[in-house]
């Protein structure tokens, strides 16, 4: 009769779990000892109980010696393994880049129309469609750049027109200020007889008319003025 396979799981009962731990621990230590003796192997075993108690076995003079040997071994082999993996990764990357460069060079030759002897009609049509799509994208980009340049030129034109209008306004203000200053100068200056006009009888009268003497009289109207006239007469 074949025994069924027992499912391994944690023993819930603490007493049963402790009894099982003691039995299995002793059996494991015995197996480790037998392996070291029968096969002349260096064996080290470390076990912590559920309560944290340490159990250990070492076929070497000390457990630490076996642990140090393990550390040195893993350090050397892990480093060598890592180096080998890095070298292989570099080789794979180099091979991948070489394939990509070859594909790009092939595409470049197709675009330039080189080495087309072995192409079929379908391949040439496909290449033509790709070129047309590329040209369409190039034209769109070119149109976009031209529109941007035109927009910048229009903005610059608006700025220049605005600056020109401001300068015209300042010029008009300066002309108006000059006219006002000139008018004030001509109206407030005293009248003078022109030097280049000859003095004649008519012009002398005009000159006398320009020289007017004013007197101040105090008294009743006509009194002082008449007496002065009689004296002068």
From Swiss-Prot:
InterPro entries: MADS-box/MEF2_TF, MEF2-like_N, TF_Kbox, TF_MADSbox, TF_MADSbox_sf
Family matches, as PROSITE patterns: K_BOX, MADS_BOX_1, MADS_BOX_2
Subcellular location: Nucleus
Keywords: DNA-binding, Nucleus, Transcription, Transcription regulation
GO terms under cellular component: nucleus
Role played: Probable transcription factor.
Name of the protein in question: MADS-box transcription factor 56
Source organism of the structure: Oryza sativa subsp. japonica (Rice)
